[in-house]
Structure formats: C-alpha cells, structure tokens
C-alpha cells in the first residue's frame, strides 16, 4: 500500500559562535520515492558535515559524515558535500515507512 508520510528535518550546530544552518522544516513523500534534504551552512571553521536520523522517543542515529567534497553512499542513503558552496544534502532512495523520522545535519 502506498501512503504519504512526513520526514521532519531539523538542524544542529557545532560549538562555534557565528555559525548558521538552513534546512526545510518538513518534507512529505510517498513510499518508493527519492527524497533530497538540503543543508546550507555558514561557519568560520569547518571540519565536516554529519547527518543523523531520530525516530520519535529515540536517540539520534548517525547516518553519514562528509569531510571532503563529493558523494558518500551507504545503502539507500547517500550524502553529498560541496565545501566551496557551503552546501550538502542527504539523499534517501526507495523510501520506506520506517524512514519517517527527524533528520539533522550538523556542522563540525
């Protein structure tokens, strides 16, 4: 059965003042779809971009980390980073109901 569900997107910063992140607040999708969650950031000291997934009532689960430009693929999830554009994204493929969660990008 195909149904629409929400992916909630949040943001988290590292410990340095003067940083900012931008992400959409929610994404609606259907099972089997491909969803791209974008993250732009501004920071004076950048070491990498991490992505986390958190289900209601649970602890955040680490998904990926990019320190260098390019695409990192891990199963159905891929993450991309462009340091020169201060931009990254998380790509979720073959979306499943269990993917309904909050997603966080975090700058280090």
UniProtKB/Swiss-Prot annotation:
Q: Where in the cell is it found?
A: Cell membrane
**Which InterPro entries does the UniProt entry name for this protein?**
Ig-like_dom, Ig-like_dom_sf, Ig-like_fold, Ig_V-set, TCR_variable_domain
Q: Which residues are glycosylated?
A: 38
Q: Which GO terms describe its biological process?
A: adaptive immune response; response to bacterium
One Pfam family this chain carries?
V-set
Q: Which SUPFAM superfamilies match?
A: Immunoglobulin
| Name this protein carries in UniProt | T cell receptor alpha variable 1-1
Endpoints of the signal sequence: 1-18
Q: Which UniProt keywords apply?
A: Adaptive immunity, Cell membrane, Disulfide bond, Glycoprotein, Immunity, Immunoglobulin domain, Membrane, Receptor, Signal, T cell receptor
- GO cellular component terms attached to this protein's record: T cell receptor complex
Specify the Ig-like domain's residue ranges: 19-108
The answer to whether the entry has keyword Membrane is yes
Q: Lineage of the native species? A: Eukaryota, Metazoa, Chordata, Craniata, Vertebrata
Subunit relationships: Alpha-beta TR is a heterodimer composed of an alpha and beta chain; disulfide-linked. The alpha-beta TR is associated with the transmembrane signaling CD3 coreceptor proteins to form the TR-CD3 (TcR or TCR). The assembly of alpha-beta TR heterodimers with CD3 occurs in the endoplasmic reticulum where a single alpha-beta TR heterodimer associates with one CD3D-CD3E heterodimer, one CD3G-CD3E heterodimer and one CD247 homodimer forming a stable octameric structure. CD3D-CD3E and CD3G-CD3E heterodimers preferentially associate with TR alpha and TR beta chains, respectively.
What does the UniProt record say this protein does? V region of the variable domain of T cell receptor (TR) alpha chain that participates in the antigen recognition. Alpha-beta T cell receptors are antigen specific receptors which are essential to the immune response and are present on the cell surface of T lymphocytes. Recognize peptide-major histocompatibility (MH) (pMH) complexes that are displayed by antigen presenting cells (APC), a prerequisite for efficient T cell adaptive immunity against pathogens.
Q: What is its main location?
A: membrane
């Amino acid at each position: 059965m195909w149904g629409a569900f929400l992916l909630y997107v949040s943001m988290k910063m590292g410990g340095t003042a003067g940083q900012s992140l931008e992400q959409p607040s929610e994404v609606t999708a259907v099972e089997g779809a491909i969803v791209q969650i974008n993250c732009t950031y501004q920071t004076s000291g950048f070491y990498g971009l991490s992505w986390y997934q958190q289900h209601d009532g649970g602890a955040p689960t680490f998904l990926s980390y990019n320190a260098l430009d390019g695409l990192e693929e891990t199963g159905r999830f891929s993450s991309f980073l462009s340091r020169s554009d201060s931009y990254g994204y998380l790509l979720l493929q073959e979306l499943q109901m269990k993917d309904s969660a909050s997603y966080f990008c975090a700058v280090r």
